Amino acid sequence: MNNLTSTKFIFVTGGVVSSLGKGLAAASIGALLQARGFKICLRKLDPYLNIDPGTMSPIQHGEVFVTDDGAETDLDLGHYERFTGVKTTKNDNITTGKVYHNLLNKERKGDYLGQTVQIIPHVTDLINSFILHNTDALDFVICEIGGTVGDIESQPFLESIRQIGYKLSKNNTVFVHLTLVPYISATMELKTKPTQHSVKELSSVGIQPDIILYRSKIPLSQEQRDKIANLCNVSPTNIIPALDVKNIYELPISYHQYNLDTQILKHFNITSPEPNLDKWENILNISHVSTKTITIAIIGKYIKLLDAYKSLIEALEHAAIHNKTKLSIHWIDSRSLNNEITNTFDNVHAILIPGGFGDDGVEGKIIAIQYARINNIPFLGICMGMQLAIIEFARNVIHLEDANSTEFNFYCKNPVIHQLPELQQNLGGSMKLGSHPCYLKVDSKIFSIYKEQVINERRRHRYTVNLQYKDLLESHGLIFTGHSHHNNNDSLAEVIELKNHPWFIGVQFHPEFKSDPFQSHPLFMSFIQASLNYQETKRHKIS
């Protein structure tokens, strides 16, 4: 580790349009500094008024990423963990809603002693406290500011980082601004005007960017970089391309090739050995040697925005890479499935039902589960996916035709899935969240996958298996092979398997939150291997 005299702060903002890749840029900066031996952490400041994204629609917001300590956070924290291996916490993501919630609680308790509570200094002070909290042992803190410069919601956050930049001075802060340089194909031109306007907007709140990352298909010419440098008051060497890549794990190497980490350290007047990027080069080399292709069907209802399944997609990609396999995902809207599925699954090698909420599309998922069970197709059910596998089995094997979850039918006669009693409160913040130990049966497929009797996985659910049906389900071949302890040492079902099926597993937890490109999660590794085995078996039958 490098011993710096003080912690350095890197602020990443975005302009022109949203979804440019600020989170990936921040994660890449973290990975590059980490590869040089520095101790880093990453934080995200979200400008929306929700306290957290837990009750936001995945179609609007994307995935809710869950941390070990049970925080429901922005999906960018998933990128942070996958790129750096540094576990994020509830202290690494804040929203405008959380700031105001804390502010009003303090005001009601009399903490402000009769002061007129205002945006400046009271709101900005709380944001500053979040950014600066528990950073003394770190070399670098990388803070991503959500949204786009110019959004009214972002103004308190921008004012806060301006204040920190002023108080800590240029020697301890750097401002990185990500913009878009659109390419006009009709005239074959790159347009720099949006970047100029974005920097002007940022400057209007008192922040002068030190480095400009420009998102583009191709690099700017030296003349174009000089133009931006002159108009935006940024050195030409600090105008760095954020080029489109086929694989997001190319980004750290790409940014290093264009000297992003070098220029950041130069700004701070820090000398450092070159980064060790061997693991990044290795993962890219492995990803290019795929010899087979498998197709996995994912049945969900949020498929209009694939960011709703971001960690799941990445976990499958990690496992495919380490199995030297190219992954093809066949996305199926669960609401489109009915009993006439005919050729829907003819060319798939596995079926996966991810987590979700609500009864919309549930019957389509159950149809897919039945198809996987009957036809011996590898199946993985996650969270609701596991619960629906139990409902399908209860209905179609045990013939409890009205078996259901109380989430979908509160008055059903056979509630094989029901709500945890202590969670029948508010919708927001009312789930079993975060990492908990799970105890596996030794004589089970899940144990052979993990090779550990006690595992720790992250949860996000408020419904669980009704264990009054456990003996009945097991007597027909659906086996419970993992459990966790609950209030008063009660058990919660965590893993199910089908006794007479090559690979049929349901898990209540979310394994996708703990996968990374360098060490694929064992459950997804096994799932991909099962898919390859099924593909091979199917090929032999055809031949």
UniProtKB/Swiss-Prot annotation:
Domain Glutamine amidotransferase type-1: start-end pairs: 295-537
A molecular function (GO) term: glutaminase activity
Region (Amidoligase domain): 1-270
Catalytic machinery residues: C383, H510, E512
Activity regulation comment: Allosterically activated by GTP, when glutamine is the substrate; GTP has no effect on the reaction when ammonia is the substrate. The allosteric effector GTP functions by stabilizing the protein conformation that binds the tetrahedral intermediate(s) formed during glutamine hydrolysis. Inhibited by the product CTP, via allosteric rather than competitive inhibition.
Record: residues binding ATP: S19, L20, G21, K22, G23, L24, D76
Pathway stated in the Swiss-Prot or TrEMBL entry: Pyrimidine metabolism; CTP biosynthesis via de novo pathway; CTP from UDP: step 2/2
Residues binding UTP: S18, K191, T192, K193, P194, T195, Q196, K227
Pfam families for this protein: CTP_synth_N, GATase
EC code: 6.3.4.2
Record has DNA damage as a keyword: no
Residues holding CTP: S18, D151, I152, E153, K191, T192, K193, P194, T195, Q196, K227
Subunit structure: Homotetramer.
Miscellaneous field: CTPSs have evolved a hybrid strategy for distinguishing between UTP and CTP. The overlapping regions of the product feedback inhibitory and substrate sites recognize a common feature in both compounds, the triphosphate moiety. To differentiate isosteric substrate and product pyrimidine rings, an additional pocket far from the expected kinase/ligase catalytic site, specifically recognizes the cytosine and ribose portions of the product inhibitor.
Family under the similarity heading: Belongs to the CTP synthase family.
PANTHER family assigned to the protein according to its UniProt record, in alphabetical order: CTP SYNTHASE, CTP SYNTHASE-RELATED
The protein's role, per its UniProt record: Catalyzes the ATP-dependent amination of UTP to CTP with either L-glutamine or ammonia as the source of nitrogen. Regulates intracellular CTP levels through interactions with the four ribonucleotide triphosphates.
Record-given protein name: CTP synthase
GN (gene name): pyrG
